[in-house]
Swiss-Prot record:
Annotated organism of origin: Bacillus subtilis (strain 168)
EC number(s) from the headed UniProt entry: 2.7.11.1
Lineage per the UniProt record: Bacteria, Bacillati, Bacillota, Bacilli, Bacillales
Gene3D superfamilies referenced in this protein's UniProt entry, alphabetically: Histidine kinase-like ATPase, C-terminal domain
Reactions accelerated catalytically: L-seryl-[protein] + ATP = O-phospho-L-seryl-[protein] + ADP + H(+); L-threonyl-[protein] + ATP = O-phospho-L-threonyl-[protein] + ADP + H(+)
CDD domains named among the record's database cross-references: HATPase_RsbT-like
Protein name, entry field: Serine/threonine-protein kinase RsbT
């Protein structure tokens, strides 16, 4: 099962579209309202980071399966400046935009799996999975 849909992130309205897509896919997979909220919050944080720090990128939403489990994978990709200090951005409360600093650590807490790959000057890819229970 690898059914992927993407939303290009270039405006704030694209963040809303990505959230809605994620909620629809989560609902279709059978996630309850609490997990739907977790997924849409994670998408919102990732899409907002693309918009604020990279200027443009995309959010992919993919249905995944592994050893009899079904889940939803979020893939956030951009070709922005990259993240110079990954350890720092994964600290609770860290923000360069004056936000709450819940961003990436919050996404990691909301989802079951989280990976981050960033190369200075080339961009960032973040993948996060929520498994259906």
């Amino acid at each position: 099962m690898n059914d992927q849909s993407c939303v290009r992130i270039m405006t704030e309205w694209d963040i809303v579209a990505a959230r809605q897509l994620g909620r629809n896919v989560a609902k279709e997979l059978g996630f309850g309202t609490v997990d739907q909220a977790r997924i849409t919050t994670a998408i919102s944080e990732l899409a907002r980071n693309i918009y604020l720090y990279a200027g443009k990128g995309q959010i992919g939403i993919e249905q995944v399966a592994d050893r009899g489990k079904k889940g939803l994978k979020i893939i956030a990709e951009d070709q922005g400046p990259g993240i110079p200090d990954i350890r720092k951005v994964m600290e609770d409360g860290f923000s360069t935009s004056g936000g709450l600093g819940a961003g990436l650590p919050g996404v990691k807490r909301l989802m079951d799996e989280f990976s981050l790959n960033s190369v200075a000057g080339e961009g960032t890819e973040i993948q996060a999975i929520k498994w259906l229970r």
